[in-house]
Amino acid sequence: MRLFTGVDLPERVHDRLERLLAVLRPTAHLIWSPVYNLHITTKFIGEWPEEKLDEMVTVLRRLPAAAPFTIALRDVGWFPGPQNPRVFWAGVHGGAALATLASTIEDALVPLGIARETREFAPHLTLARIRRPVPLQAMRQAIANLESFDFGTVETDRFHLYESRPGSAGTVYSKLAEFKLGESSSSGSSRRKGA
């Protein structure tokens, strides 16, 4: 199983992002992310044995309680930069609370043998990937003509454990477990999907 943890996006945010991508998709031949797949990754875990899934869920269930917080989604940009970009992204602004959630999850998973990230936590939504050089002038002009890059907010009171599976129509993300913030995990702050 290929796993990661993340924060889901509400439908109203999906709708705003879809309106943006409907304008931009025709302007450049990129590998565009399906809006329904967009999420805020807090920790990429990688391959994990299915028979040990309950062990991981138990560890995440024991995270210390954290207060719910708000994430703002706004702005767009390029990784690593506007020259020869590889990723087109939307900005995720969760402040210290989101960074703390990510580091708390990471710390909890280290005893399971999950390596720490070597790069600084940089939350974003991957809107498109660029595998080879393509003309971007029309896309840049379309971006310049847009008036707003405010995609709304996410009232974050939970995160999920996801499985990532390749499919014929692209990658499919499935929620395996849900973990609520603001409650101690021992009081039932998580549940296994389908349990």
Task: Label every model-predicted segment.
Residues 1-195:
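Histidine-dependent nucleotide/RNA phosphoesterase domain, centered on the 2H-phosphoesterase fold
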